[in-house]
């Protein structure tokens, strides 16, 4: 019956085991939390399947987790009577990691123990955490609904391989036995185990029982009994007033498998047209796969306290995919499926309500705890920027949450909101001015800012890759248009001063110069014109309002899409000494060299690169040698 075979671990499992034992050793007691959490999940899955197949309970519907130890053998056992596993499932779940992006995750790990610990926690170590304290682990399991002789024994020393064989197992569920290392015998102590379970698993909605000794009236040991040691009431069903912050934090870690505390949470019970309870969390750290579109996200879904599914993504818009938590609805049917959820009025109403609550949470965090919000923005700001394109109904509320670097702060930290900017707008200023660039340094030092710096007009400095795309959906805020300072047809309106209005005479002197430049460059540029927006720079290139910007063209190129040709307007500063010098050159070849120099400088400042940098270097060298 044994049919024993020995298999090698998947490469990624080997790596994860080695890294985990090294990185998580200082927080080793979490292995018990992880194993109890898995047992709780197994019970949830059995309850769900038994909705349509009650015979799976096999006459034992009293679901629980049990913990026992044998100090003589040095073993600790965690068992449950949940869904159980077949032989194939044991191999799939315990011998391989099925998550997409695992290789990328492992490559992100380095030698920083604290950082690695956080990353591994986010990835979800689950069962493998047993090897932090054990040098051998045995798993005995039988799936619900299969014969007793279809049990499986999986065993490993956590090194390169594991064995798997068929066994007879009378009881449904899974039993995990840890053979503890010599220096981990502290976990063979009932009070130590009670302490850990009280700390990490008191909120589990499943009884956690420990095998404890019984004593007679004379104090002599008379036997053993199973004793429940947790509240065994689903945390979200309890009154908010009786739940401590620590309990909320530990429950977050239970449902998210994160090691870090959440930044914020909101617990609501709603009655009326809809009846549901929601418990939403804002994590403190972005998961390693936040930008992996294939990775599932969403809330845990319960219907009338019965677990239905993990990652019910339909209740949260994609731009809030970082939110964690659960929804317990009284209005959805118990036999609900992902397909039914997709096209359901109740679902749509719940999604709308939960989106609103999530945005309110973030608004409150930004207002009441700006330091925590700064952490949130650093971790999740890029994802939130997708919101104005996805959620038109909440566009203004989402944009209110955005933060940017600004010329006002002289710092790369993104901590300026649109409301901050508007509160500092100059008298007569009608627009919110911004610039997009590849980096904060490039934005801050752009020649397009020279006039704004001179006049003391604040400009938002945007350097995230998504910014240009975001701005194509967000053209105004609070009735104020958002205006790029790089546009050729930039209009400062009432902020234009008399000095600029009286420069026509000077412009006329340069008319013939401008015509020479136009003739020389021809179709290479859209237009050539005099500009007074520059103070220290001889020339810039700019695009019209209806043209694709440089940053958007770069986005297209990076995504492999065809990029329309961008023809720039060449703007020349008549006050600059280089321009004055070029205007005096009569030799057409030399004049062409000077104009080529000015145009290439402007293109380099705008785009960050040139099509032919070698030719530009030769040109600069030739002019310097004269």
UniProtKB/Swiss-Prot annotation:
Pfam families: HATPase_c_3, HSP90. GO terms for molecular function: ATP binding; ATP hydrolysis activity; ATP-dependent protein folding chaperone; unfolded protein binding. Residues 555-626 are annotated as: C. Disulfide bonds: none annotated. Its main location: cytoplasm. One of its GO terms (cellular component) is cytoplasm. Residues 1-338 are annotated as: A. Keywords: ATP-binding, Chaperone, Cytoplasm, Nucleotide-binding, Stress response. It is found in: Cytoplasm. InterPro entries: HATPase_C_sf (IPR036890), Heat_shock_protein_90_CS (IPR019805), HSP90_C (IPR037196), Hsp90_fam (IPR001404), Hsp90_N (IPR020575), Ribosomal_Su5_D2-typ_SF (IPR020568). Residues 339-554 are annotated as: B. The keyword Metal-binding does not apply. Molecular chaperone. Has ATPase activity. Homodimer. This is Chaperone protein HtpG. It comes from Mannheimia succiniciproducens (strain KCTC 0769BP / MBEL55E). The lineage of its organism: Bacteria, Pseudomonadati, Pseudomonadota, Gammaproteobacteria, Pasteurellales. The gene is htpG.
């Amino acid at each position: 019956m044994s049919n024993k075979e020995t298999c090698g671990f998947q490469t990624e499992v080997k790596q994860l085991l080695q890294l985990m034992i090294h990185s998580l050793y200082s927080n080793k007691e979490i292995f018990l939390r992880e194993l109890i959490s898995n047992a709780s999940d197994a019970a949830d899955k059995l309850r769900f399947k038994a909705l349509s197949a009650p015979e799976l309970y096999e006459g034992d519907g009293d679901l629980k987790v049990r913990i026992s130890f044998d100090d003589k053998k040095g073993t600790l056992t965690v068992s449950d009577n949940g869904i159980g596993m077949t032989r194939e499932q044991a191999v799939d779940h315990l011998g391989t990691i099925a998550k997409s992006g695992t290789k990328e995750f492992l490559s992100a790990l380095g030698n920083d123990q604290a950082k690695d610990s956080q990353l591994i926690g986010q990835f979800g170590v689950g069962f493998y955490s047993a090897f932090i304290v054990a040098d051998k682990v045995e798993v005995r399991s039988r799936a619900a609904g299969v014969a007793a002789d279809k049990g499986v024994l999986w065993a490993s020393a956590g090194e390169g391989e594991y064995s798997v064989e068929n066994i007879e197992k009378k009881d449904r569920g899974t039993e995990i036995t840890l053979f503890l290392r010599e220096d981990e015998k502290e976990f063979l102590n009932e009070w130590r185990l009670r302490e850990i379970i009280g700390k990490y698993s008191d909120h589990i909605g499943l009884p956690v029982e420990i095998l404890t000794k019984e004593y007679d009236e004379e104090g002599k040991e008379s036997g053993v009994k199973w004793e429940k040691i947790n509240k065994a009431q689903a945390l979200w069903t309890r009154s908010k007033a009786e739940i401590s912050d620590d309990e909320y934090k530990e429950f977050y870690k239970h449902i998210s498998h994160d090691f870090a505390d959440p930044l914020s949470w909101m617990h609501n019970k709603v009655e009326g047209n809809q009846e549901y309870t929601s418990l939403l969390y804002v994590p403190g750290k972005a998961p390693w796969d936040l930008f992996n579109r294939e990775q599932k996200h969403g809330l845990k879904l319960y219907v009338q306290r019965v677990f239905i599914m993990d990652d019910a993504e339909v209740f949260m818009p994609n731009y809030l995919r970082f939110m964690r938590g659960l929804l317990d609805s009284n209005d959805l049917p118990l036999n609900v499926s992902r397909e039914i959820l997709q096209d359901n009025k109740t679902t749509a109403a719940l999604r709308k309500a939960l989106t609103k609550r999530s945005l309110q949470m973030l608004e409150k965090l930004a207002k009441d705890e700006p330091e925590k919000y700064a952490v949130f923005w650093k971790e999740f700001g890029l994802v939130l920027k997708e919101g104005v394109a996805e959620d038109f109904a909440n566009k203004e509320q989402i944009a209110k949450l955005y933060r940017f670097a600004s010329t006002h702060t002289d710092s790369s930290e993104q901590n300026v909101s649109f409301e901050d900017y508007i509160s500092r707008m100059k008298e007569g200023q009608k627009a919110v001015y911004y610039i997009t660039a590849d980096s904060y340094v490039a934005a801050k030092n752009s020649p397009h800012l020279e006039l704004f710096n001179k006049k003391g007009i604040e400009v938002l400095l945007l350097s995230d890759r998504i910014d240009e795309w975001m701005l194509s959906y967000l053209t105004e805020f609070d009735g104020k248009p958002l205006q790029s300072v790089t546009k050729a047809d930039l209009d400062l309106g009432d902020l234009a001063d008399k000095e600029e209005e009286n420069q026509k005479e000077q412009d006329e002197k340069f008319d013939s110069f401008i015509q020479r430049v136009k003739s020389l460059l021809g179709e290479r540029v859209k237009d050539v014109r005099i500009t007074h927006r520059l103070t220290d720079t001889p020339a810039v290139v700019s695009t019209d309002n209806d043209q694709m910007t440089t940053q958007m063209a770069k986005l297209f190129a990076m995504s492999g899409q065809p990029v329309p040709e961008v023809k720039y307007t060449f703007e020349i500063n008549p006050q600059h000494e280089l321009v004055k010098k070029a205007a005096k050159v009569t030799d057409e070849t030399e004049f062409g060299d000077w104009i080529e120099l000015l145009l290439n400088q402007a293109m380099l400042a705008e785009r960050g690169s040139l099509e032919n940098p070698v030719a530009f270097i030769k040109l600069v060298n030739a002019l310097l040698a004269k």
